[in-house]
Structures are given as structure tokens and as C-alpha cells.
Amino acid sequence: MCPEEGGAAGLGELRSWWEVPAIAHFCSLFRTAFRLPDFEIEELEAALHRDDVEFISDLIACLLQGCYQRRDITPQTFHSYLEDIINYRWELEEGKPNPLREASFQDLPLRTRVEILHRLCDYRLDADDVFDLLKGLDADSLRVEPLGEDNSGALYWYFYGTRMYKEDPVQGRSNGELSLCRESERQKNVSNVPGKTGKRRGRPPKRKKLQEEIISSEKQEENSLTSDLQTRNGSRGPGQGTWWLLCQTEEEWRQVTESFRERTSLRERQLYKLLSEDFLPEICNMIAQKGKRPQRTKPELQHRFMSDHLSIKSIKLEETPMLTKIEKQKRREEEEERQLLLAVQKKEQEQMLKEERKREMEEKVKAVEDRAKRRKLREERAWLLAQGKELPPELSHLDLNSPMREGKKTKDLFELDDDFTAMYKVLDVVKAHKDSWPFLEPVDESYAPNYYQIIKIPMDISSMEKKLNGGLYCNKEEFVNDMKTMFRNCRKYNGDSSEYTKMSDNLERCFHRAMTKHFPGEDGDTDEEFWIKEDEKREKRRSRSGRSSGSHVWTRSRDTEGSSRKQPPVENGGKSLPPARRAASSGDDQSRSSIQLPPEVGTSHGQGFSRPLHCGRVPSHAPPLNQMRPAAPGTFGSLQGSDPTNLHGSSRIPEAPPGEPLQHPPFAIQAPVGISNHRGSLLSAPDLSNMGSHVPSLQLGQMNCPSQDGNMYPPAPFQAGFIPSRHGGTPARPPDFPESSEIPPGHIYHSYKYLNRAHPAVWNGNHGTTNPGRLGPDEKPHLGPGPSHHPHTLGHMMDGRVMRQPIPPNQWTKQSSFLPHGVPSSGYMQPPCKSAGHRLQPPPTPAPSPRFRGPSQALRGAQGGESMMDSPEMIAMQQLSSRVCPPGVPYHPRQPTPPQLPGPFPQVAHSASVCVSAPKPALDNPGSTQEMTETHEPEEDPAEPLPGHEEKAASICSSEGVYLKQLPHPAPPLQASCTRQSSPQERETEDSQLKSDASDSADTYKTSKNKNTWPLDNSYSSPAVQGCLRDLSIVAETGNLPENGVVGEASPCRSEGKGLDGSGSEKPLCPRGKTLQEAVPCTGPNATTPPCTDPSLMAATVNQFSPLYMPGIEYSNSATQYPMSPSLQGLASMMGGKSSGSQPQSFPPRGFQANGPHPGLFPRYRPQQGMRYSYQPPSQPSYHPYQRTPYYTCPQGFSDWQRSLPSQRSPSGPPGSHPPRSLFSEKNVLSSLQGCETLNTALTSPTQMDVVTAKVVPPDGHNSGPEEEKMDESVERPESPKEFLDLDNHNAATKRQNSLSTSDYLYGTPPPSLSSGMTFGSSAFPPHSVMLQTGSPYTPQRSASHFQPRAYPSPVPAHPPPHPVATQPNGLSPEDSLYCCQEEGLGHFQASMMEQTGTGSGLRGSFQEVHRPPGLQMHPVQSQSLFPKTPAPAASPEQLPPHKTPTLPLDQS
């Protein structure tokens, strides 16, 4: 019955309404999501048929709760909400009359109620929570489609459960028409659902819209079915079919299925197959399970359909546990299936991404490997070109074939979006370029005839933009290829010389810049390296550091183009040049690379070393450097600009191949004023070696010509034979030396000698900055934790011709003196617990702290004529030292006792170091030369520690600062003792006091003579010594010495030492009075030592630390070569006191032995036992600058200094035309120099200053004989330059020395002095907290040089020692330790060895004479024994105190 008729519909008619199964299907489908009641179609049918108000009201209330998103709608209160939604949606939107205006819902006909229920289901899908609740459901599961169709056009529908409906075709329409109509209608409806059939363009719809479209499709489908039903019922127009229940039991399903078995039509056979295979088995199971369920009673149903869904759930759990379990299981299975599907999809996606990443990584790795291979080939090619050799075929044509990715990789959507955005930006930049107009549109043959015949793949910007808009570029490579094709086409059609081609090149550069900007670069994409000039960035740095370098710097840049930058010269088919050739080919370079250097500046055969340019064009004795070819090709072909902060490579001395003599490479030397008439600058080898197109600021060496700015006093260069420091990486290995991280210490010349692993700021570095060197192509960076960038120290590789024969690497550790008697030191080039591989590097120093002050002002750019003493550091040093120790106030610091050291270092004596001058008329005693030369060195007991001795001798010198970093305790070093400049009035007073103190000094000398057990050594000298020698030279010429010729020794720590001696003298004991220059302060270049100071005494304290290599104490007078604790920060610059000259002299290396069996290895060193450098300024220089001997050569024993060695060992000795000559012709000269020598001792022996102070030359001038001379040899000299800081309390220390006994020392015996630069004796460690100070804080009286040595009045030969010590072939004692460190003994004079440039003084001699100790016999080519010792006056044995047992130093016992 139809609803319009108003009667209750029969059950058959109710089953013919398609809305009923639609409502049941909807509730079943969205039951969980919308919290709808659970029922079957049969139950809904029964409720509608029986007019079950409660069931229908509960269903309506649940649907309205979802529509209004309110939980307070109940079956009792739903009427108002129902009226509201029907009024709004039914009447206003659909335009139908509102049936609820006339009656309530219960009074409406059944048909209308069913329609309202179905419409409420549609409204529920429009609620706001649908999108979130249905996001896990598939759209296909929401759609109901017929199972099939028979030949009559009837459709078979299955919603859910066990029922199947049949829709008969519309009456009056043929089966074909009905079928076609339904098919087209179905296709139209389905096409509205995305993802079903027709693909829709544009953005995918949102979920909510998707659900709405799904529901609307259902509505349309249902409406069509309803219209069919109504048409068949006669209530609607024609063209609609009728619905009826076909089957719901198992028998009915089987009958319907069997009815299609014998059918022959395709549709019916498909329908039969579907029903028989898919539906029939499942439907039978479902019917069987339904039959097993307990019959529900009416009260159960009433409870189930209560308005509150939660209460219904609880009742169901209590009363129907079986149904609840089944329901939960079903839901669980559905959820598991959905989760499993999601997991599978996610896993597959992750696997794809993983494979893509792996492929990309493999491509990148391969690209990087290929790039490294090509780079190595280029470097090898450049190296061969530099050698002038022919290139093998594989190196002739090096292609820059960057790896291209094979195939198109599908990127993620977001990656594609980013790439497309970047491509658009790049394209916009290219289009906006001024030269892009010829490429904007396709080429027209009207103005480009035959273009498309020549160009097969035309391309233009508009075509690329179209492809980009169409999404045809899957990756940027395609985009780049099209752009390159466009540029290639232009070049191909127009030729290289066309204006269009030039515009194409400009546009291509613009394109590359845009690509670099918008596409982040990937490693391995290309191996092209581009070099740009960077003048502006360097300008500020160069001006700040005070250097004047005239050229620009080549640095590496990723930028392929630079509109404002010069492009590097392009060779080899467009590749960027290797660094060496690139620099050489640049036309505006001021200096040429190794390939294009002129003969006097260029390298030999393209090696990385350049010949120094001499103004006089004097031939430099450079060996053929191809003999020094590195072990691996490309060792010197370091990339130009690989480190932008250091554009000149580390200077390396490659070892000669076995069997070839190692010839000394030439190095810049400095001419004295008077020969060259100006201080020219020499370009040192490391600066010319790998500098490429840039002449860097010459930090260590300068051209020996006026600089470009007209400066006649540029920084001083290295002396001949001196090899500047290497700055980058480990040194080159000999050909037979295996490459490993464990480089034995004997093979490496370490760049620094300091104990606490900190950089010393040396003079010849730039101020406060580091100058890192570049590593070569095959060179490894530093092995240890230290930085690869070091300051320019003066530690350099030595010349092999003056060094001991090397020993094989496998015998290094077998040497008895590998470390002191085999006992490693905690500071031996490594912090404790570091492996041997870490010995090579100093610790990282981020920035030079005030603790390690920068180089002196002269090296930072002070021009000639400016005194180093005027530098801010020296002024601050004067102020600080004046505050630390005012004259007359003894300074007795209380320092913690250093812990007892193992091995040969137990006897760290306290640092009371007072130099004693012999109160003997040495100037007129010719015999004093022999006495001073050789003394017995008493035996020393190294096992006699006095750890409990806390009372330090009064004069605690700063040389303890050398040991400070070696000792475990962190006590800060003492402040430098007071230094003051003596006024002329004071000097006169001091002169008078000097005579009165002479006798006391003599007694003290006798007492201390045997205490000093450090062997004599004079391998270095201090500014104080030089100043003293200069004063002595004046005295020697004037002859106005005091009657006894005694000048009290000046102790740098004199204010501290004053308490030791009762004289109460507060004035420096270096008075000139009427004769000498008034006591010049002993800290600067003018710091003078008394003329009577025994040079052997000075040498004595210098060289006891033979076996122990102590980094940092090699250069006793280097600028701040010694680590300083914070208490000495203000005094840092004092260590290398500034003098008037423009630059400190560079120093000669200890040469290699040219004909040694192992030419590639560095020979080990022998600490000097002879005197340090006592200087004698002759009246006129004897040699030209290039003929100067080095300041000192390989260290030797005390008696080795006088021996002439074979000529081939002299790296830069005087020419053969100059006969060997001694420094002194009169021994009284030497006697007057004892004060200087003692002062030299003060540089290194902080602990024995008081001991040496007591040393007195017998007044009668009688030679005490060999025994006393040998004993005198053991007398230690003070080792701290700090002792030059104050001469006030010299008498006090001299007198106190009489009472000083063995117990006064911390460990029982006087500590040895510093050796030639890096070794200790048995009692090597003085107490902590003392610092080596060299240099004077006072302005020198002469502004000729930094440190004007005033050593000896006349260059008269001295007598050789009577008892030379037996040495090995190169003059070294056999027990010497193996310290093949790069700058071992190199920087002894880096603070004080200044060139004499005083004008018109007449007291200057040649360089060798100025810096030559007494007794030196100059051999034309001999450099190993350049500084023989002179005999020193010694006290008789009966004058020596009985309580001190004579001992021999460790290296001579």
C-alpha cells in the first residue's frame, strides 16, 4: 500500500521499498562510527511493520544526536529537533512540503516515516564529525551496486546480511533500453565518485567533500531505484522498476543460483559465477550462525534500543555476552585488517625510500671518489709540468666528466615542489639578464638561415618555461641539460667569436650563479674548483699585521663566476688550472711561480724551493733541488689557496735519495750595514717555494733589496744556511721511511720547544696570529691534538752538513741517549699519557693569549732604526719588572717544592742563579784565555734529591719558567726580577762599588766553582751578553778597566739575590765607570756583563741538559720561547727585548751531514758544551752578507768548539779565501769578557746564578792549569736571562755564594743549565715558577741593531783548548741523545742574535767575528766548530769548598 493511501503497509509491500534495506545498510555500515543501534534488516522491517514506536524513536534520536552534535536528544524530546531539520532541509532546501506541519511523526503514514528515516541518514552524513569519523574507511565500501543483471534487464541487489533484492525493469521499456538507461545512469553516478572511473583533473578533494560526493551518489542511485519502484507501483512516471525481496533463506539462495546455471547469456553466466562462488557459501554460513543465536525476547530488544547508547551497551554486555563478543571480534578484525594494510603500505614506502637513499649515497660516494681521482691526476699533471717532464697519455687530457645520475628518479612531492620553485627562480633570473633576449623565443630561420638543419635539438627559454609549467622536468638535471643545450646550440651555430656566443657565455655564467644560489650544492656533483682574487678581504689583515705584500691572494671559491672577479686562466679544455700553474699563468702576478721564476729567484727544476734573490747577484749555493724530490709525487704541489689564511706553503726540505749528497739549499742572508749600505730584505726560500702568484708578507725572510715602499730597513732575513720553519703538517719523510702516524721523535724537527704544549709567540711571527702552513697534496695533517696552524717560530730544519750522521730509524730508541738515560720525560714533546704519535704537535691554541705574547715590534713591521726597546711590550716589561723588584728590596718568593722527578731529574735545584765575574785583571792577562777555556767538571751525583728544601736561593731566575710546564705542579713562574736603567750617576757609583766587591767576588767564586756541574756551552747568547760584549769592546780599546779588572757579575735576579750577600749593593755590577759603559741594564741588548766574567763560566751552565729534550727551552733568549704562567704575562715581551734594529736576525741551522749514510734522516744533536756565543764586534765586517757563518752550528762538547771540522760540513762558512781566524789576539781581552760569558750563563741557569757569581779569576792572572780549568768547566752559569734584568744586587749574591752549599739546592746538586737548546742534564729541573727572560726593557744606547753584541775588543785569534774532548766524526760526543727535532737548537738566538747595524762605531766586525766566541778558528767551510771555547781561569782545587763532591755531567761521565 502506498503511503498516500494512509493505511498500514503490508509486509510484502514494505519489502518492496528500497529505502528499508538502504536504512539498514546505513546503520550497519556506520554503526560504530555514528554510535547507532545494532539491528538486522528483519528487525527494522518488523518494527516498521508493527509500528514499534520505541525502536523507531530510538533510531531517530541517535540520528538526530549526530546531526546536531548533541547528546541530550532522547526518544522523548526528539520531536522538536526533527521538525526543525525537516523544515530546514526538506522544505527549504529540497522544496518539498513539510509533512510535520500537519501531524506528528507517529501520525504520519509509514511510507512518509520511512522516507524521513532515510533522509535523516543522509543528513547525518552532513555533520561536522563525519570527516574525522570516516577517515579510515574506503570510499568503495560506502557504495552499493547491483550484483548483476539478467537477460530481462532485472537487477540483483545485495546490501548486507542474508537478503538479496531484485529490481524488475520498468514496464513499457524494452530490456535493451532499460539496460542502456541504467548503465548510462550508473556510469554518470559513478563518475562523480573520485577514484572510480573518470580521472578528474586538479587538486584532490578533501575528505569531507569526498564523503559528501559518495553520499550524493548513493542518493542519486537510491532516487533512481525509488523512481523505478514508484513507477512500477504506478505512483510515479514511467521508466522505473519495482523492488522485491528475492531470497533470504538458504534454500532460496540455492534456487536462485541454480536458476542461472543453464543460462547461456554472458550476463547471466557472470551472475551465476558470482553467486555460486562468492555469495552462496558465505550466505549459508551466515544463515547457520544466525539460526544458532538465541531468540531475542521483546524486553531484550526494548533494553537494547534505549536512547542512551552507553546504557544499551552495558545491558548488551550483561545479557548477550555472545553477541558482544562477536561484535568485538568483528570490529577487531576490521581494525586489524586496516592497520595491516596501512603497515604494509608504510613498509613498502619506507623500503622504497631506503633504496632511493642508498642509491643516492652510492652515487655520491662514487662521484667523490671519481673527483678525488681526477684531482690527484691533475696534481700529478701539474707536478710533471713543473718538472718540465713529458706527460703520459692518461694525463694529457683530463676530462671534467661530472657523474650524471642514471635514469629519472622520482622525488618526493615536497622535493619536487622545492625543485620546481628553484627552477622557476633560476629561469626568472636568466630571463632578466641583459643578454638573454636572443634566447627568449625559438629561433626563426628568417634571420638564422639553415638553423634547424644545423641544430637538431633546438632549445630556448620559452620552451623551457613551457616544459616547466607542464611539469615535464622530473629533476634539475633535465632542466640544466636543456639550458646547456641552448648554450651549446648557440656556440655551434654562431662560432666562438660571435657576439651571440659571448652573450651566451655571459648568460651561462648568470645561470650557474643562479643555480648555485637556489640549488644547494651537493658534494661530489662536480670537481671543478674556481679561484678568485681576493684583494679586499686581505687588505685589512695585511695592514693590521704591518706587512706590505704587493700581490693579491688566490683563494678557492665555489662560485663558478664572479661578475666583479677575475676568472682564473683556463687551460686544458676549460678545466681550472692546478694551483701551481694557475698562479703561474696569471698575468698580474708580481712574483712568478716555480715554473716561471727567473734564474735568480726561481726554483731549481720546478721544485718548491726558490733561490734567494741577492742584490749583488752573488751566486747562491743551491743544490739541484731535483735531488731533493719528495718521496711521493705532488708533495710540494699543495693546492694554491687550499688554506686561505696562509698562501705560502710550509717550507720543506725533502731528503736526498740514498746515495746522493745532500747539498744545502740556499737561503736568504743579511748584509751588514757598511757593505750593503742598507738593510735590504731577502726573500727566503719558504716564501718563494710554493707561493704561486703571490709574494706573501715576508715574515721570516725578506728580499735583500729595498722594499716596494722604499723602506731601507725591512725585517731581517734568515742567515745563510738557515732553513726557516715549516708550518704545515709533519715533515717530509725520507724515501726509505715508512708512512705511519707514529713518527719517531728523532725524525721530526718539532716546531716548538715548550713544556706545557702551548705556542710560544716568537718574534718572527705575526703579532698574535698564526700563520698556518699548507699541507701538500700527499701530506697528512698533524697527527696529534695540536693545531695545524702554528705561529712562525724559529724552529727550523737543520742543515745536514753540520749535523751528526743520522742513524737508522730502527735504532732510535736503542740509543743510550734517546731520552736521558732512557727515562722519558713528561714534557718530551708530548703531554703525559700521550702516544708517540702525538709528540709532534703542540697543543691547539685557538688564539695567542697574553701568556704567549706575539712577536716583537720589529718583526711585526717596525722599520729599521726603531728600537725594539721602544715597543709597548718592552715598556710594559720595564714597568712590570720595576714593580716586581724595586732596587734594594730582595725578592724571596715562596714557591711550592716541585715534586721529585723520576730518572735523571731528581736534582731540580732551586733557581738561585747569580753570575760571578772573576775579579782578575783579565784584560792584561794573556794566560786567562787558557784558564777560561777548560775546566774540570766535577762529578755530579744525580741521585741526591733534597725535596724538602724549600728555601730558594735569593735569585730565582725566570729560566725556571722553562721547566714550569714540564713539572707537574702548576705554580706560576716568578715575575722577572727588577730591571732598571742605570743613570750615569749610578754608573759612577757602581764603578766605585765594583772595586770594593772584587775580593768578595773572588771568594765566592772559589766557593761556587765546584758546585757548578753543568758543562759549559755557549751555543746561544742573550741580548744581555751582546750588550755586555759591546761594552767590553769599548773597554778593551780604551783599556780603562778598574785596577783589578773586576767587574761584579750582574744577576738578572739580582734583587732576589741581594739577600744572599752582605754587601748590600743595590746597584748593577756591570759598571763602566770611567772605563766601561755605565752599568747598562742586563735585560736588553745593552745589558752588559762584567768584562771579567769567565766565558767558560757562562758556557758552563748552559749545557748540562744533554739527554733530555725539553720543548720550549731551546732558545734561551728567544722572544717568548718559554711558556709563561699568568704572573709573567706582562713580562712576556721582555724575553726578547726590543732593540733598535728593525728585525732580529734569523739563525743558521745545524747542518746535515751531506755524506752521511742516511741522507734522508736528520742527524741527532749534541748539546753544546762549549761557551755560548760571546760576541766580538770587530771594527769592520769581514765577510759579505752571503758569506757569513751561521750564528752557531751543531752543538759540541766544551772542547769541541776549537776543533776544525772537515770543510764539507760547513753550511755557510766563510769563503776559502778568508783564512780561519780567532776572535782574540790577546788573552786579556778574554779576561775582560768573562763577565759577558758569565752573563751568557745567566741566560740558562736560574739555579746556579749564585754559584757562578762566586767565581773569581785569581787576581794575579796566573793560569791555574789544566786541572783547575777542567774544574772550571763544570762551574755552572746562570741560565736565565732574567738575571740580566737587575744588576743591583750582584754583590749580595756574590757574598752569599760563600755560604751556599750543596744543601742549598733543592735536590742536592746544582741543576744543570740549559743545553744548546733542548737537553737537560741529570739535575735538569729547577723549581717551578721561574721563567727565562732575555732581552732588556731599556732603550739601547745605540740604535744600530736589535741586539748589538759587544763582545770582544779585537778580532785576535784565541788559543785552542789544551784538552779537547774526544768526539764522534762530526765533533759530537758519542753519548749525545737523539733529538732530530726540526728546530732543535735553531732558535737560540731568535731573540738576541741581531745584526749589528750601528753606524760609525768602529767596534763592529764581520758577522762571524761579532758572534764568535773566543778561541774560534774560522775555517772557510767549517761550521761545526765555529764557536770553540777559550780557556777560562779556574781556581785551584784547594780553594774549592770541600763539601762538594766533584762530578761529571751525564754526557761526559
From Swiss-Prot:
Residues 210-222, 985-998, 1265-1289 have a biased composition (Basic and acidic residues). The keyword Nucleotidyltransferase does not apply. Residues 197-209 have a biased composition (Basic residues). Its main location: nucleus. It is found in: Nucleus. Residues 223-234, 637-649, 999-1020, 1228-1250, 1291-1304, 1331-1346 have a biased composition (Polar residues). Disruption phenotype: Perinatal death with high penetrance due to cranial neural tube defects. Exencephaly is frequently associated by open eyelids. Defects may be due to misregulation of mesenchymal/ectodermal transcription factors. Fetuses also show specific inner ear defects, such as smaller cochleae as well as rotational defects of sensory cells and extra cell rows in the inner ear reminiscent of planar cell polarity (PCP) mutants. Residues 655-664, 887-905, 1352-1364 have a biased composition (Pro residues). InterPro entries: Bromodomain, Bromodomain-like_sf, Bromodomain_CS, CECR2. GO terms for biological process: chromatin remodeling; cochlea development; execution phase of apoptosis; inner ear receptor cell stereocilium organization; neural fold formation; neural tube closure; neural tube development; single fertilization. The modification Asymmetric dimethylarginine is found at R1166, R1172. The modification Phosphoserine is found at S402, S551, S983, S1280. PROSITE patterns: BROMODOMAIN_1 (PS00633), BROMODOMAIN_2 (PS50014). It holds the Pfam family Bromodomain. Disulfide bonds: none annotated. Component of the CERF-1 ISWI chromatin remodeling complex (also called the CECR2-containing remodeling factor (CERF) complex) at least composed of CECR2 and SMARCA1. Component of the CERF-5 ISWI chromatin remodeling complex at least composed of CECR2 and SMARCA5/SNF2H. LUZP1 is detected as part of the CERF-1 and CERF-5 complexes in embryonic stem (ES) cells where it is involved in complex stabilization but is not detected in the complexes in the testis. Interacts with CCAR2; CCAR2 may form part of the CERF-1 and/or CEF-5 ISWI chromatin remodeling complexes in ES cells. Regulatory subunit of the ATP-dependent CERF-1 and CERF-5 ISWI chromatin remodeling complexes, which form ordered nucleosome arrays on chromatin and facilitate access to DNA during DNA-templated processes such as DNA replication, transcription, and repair. The complexes do not have the ability to slide mononucleosomes to the center of a DNA template. The CERF-1 ISWI chromatin remodeling complex has a lower ATP hydrolysis rate than the CERF-5 ISWI chromatin remodeling complex. PANTHER family: CAT EYE SYNDROME CRITICAL REGION PROTEIN 2, CHROMATIN REMODELING REGULATOR CECR2. This is Chromatin remodeling regulator CECR2. The gene is Cecr2.
